[in-house]
Amino acid sequence: MSFNNNLTNELNLLSQFNLSNEQDGIKIHHDAASELISAAEKLHDKGLITQKDGGYLTDLGRKAAEHTQALSSILK
């Protein structure tokens, strides 16, 4: 399995969440890059974030973000 651009955008967005504070969410503004808006919508549709424009991680989203950030640290 390779990481296509859409998946890469979703992984990049998951890596933006601050895992040390569950009260830190993110907000994707309407004038953000279309790829970022699309990634947020897809993560929301998959049940990983609470709002289509960001919000907070769900329980599943937190697990995904933890794995994403761990993988990023390993590969750096």
Where are each of the predicted segments found?
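Short amphipathic alpha-helical interface segments
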Residues: 1-38, 70, 74-76
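A short, conserved structural fragment
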Residues: 44-55
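Accessory beta->alpha helical hairpin/"wing" motif in late/C-terminal subdomains of nucleic-acid enzymes
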Residues: 53-76
